[in-house]
Amino acid sequence: NGHEVGTHPYGYTPFSYDITDYVKVGEENMITVKVDHQTPSSRWYSGSGIYRSVDLTITDPVHVDLYGTKIETPNLKEEAANGTVNADVKATVVNESDTAQEVTLTHTVFPKGGDKEDEIGTATTEAQSIEAGERATIDAKVAVTGAELWSTEAPNLYTVRTEVKVGGEVVESYDTDYGFRYVKFHPDTGFSL
């Protein structure tokens, strides 16, 4: 709507801007993304343009921070042989409302492109209070059964859906893609994935 919200000097890293204060609710809005490449900014090919997706994300005042989900499987190699893998899921939740909120998270793991009903693991956290204007990282352990490992030959991917609940009501759903894989270094065979 004619306001510059921000600039980003480097094209190979993700970035986002909160445009809430510039949106005219109930009216037509113009959102412009512009590339202005007057001076080369790299020693490599300095072409320019938009070559990845540009997304408009609408969130509830209480939501998972952008790129706010971290998933780790520290014992994957040992646990995968038994069929159940314990995933440590950390989600950073932001409370942009005017009051403290009691937040509960439910993490559900299912094959990418599938439905939540195809879940192979789920966990719900205890309620946690997040003060107005604050953020909190909430930890959970999800027992995942039957996950197929990711490899270059079989790039199996899963979606970890994080549902944010306030007062028992789901106010946001945030998806993170994940592949269950581990790396190995060996003096004779080198690096393997």
Predicted regions and their residues:
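Beta-strand-rich binding/interaction modules
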Residues: 82-129, 136-140
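Short, solvent-exposed loop/linker segments at the N-terminal edge
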Residues: 73-85
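Hydrophobic/tyrosine-rich beta-strand signature of extracellular beta-sandwich/beta-rich modules
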Residues: 33, 107, 160-162
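Short glycine/proline/serine/threonine-rich loop/turn segments at secondary-structure transition edges
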Residues: 23-28, 42, 100, 144-159
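Accessory beta-strand-rich segments of carbohydrate-active enzymes
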Residues: 1-73, 97, 113
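Exposed aromatic-hydrophobic patches
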Residues: 14-21, 135-143
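N-terminal carbohydrate-binding accessory modules
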Residues: 68-69, 75, 161-193
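Short acidic/polar inter-strand loop motif in beta-rich domains
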Residues: 36-42, 149, 165-171
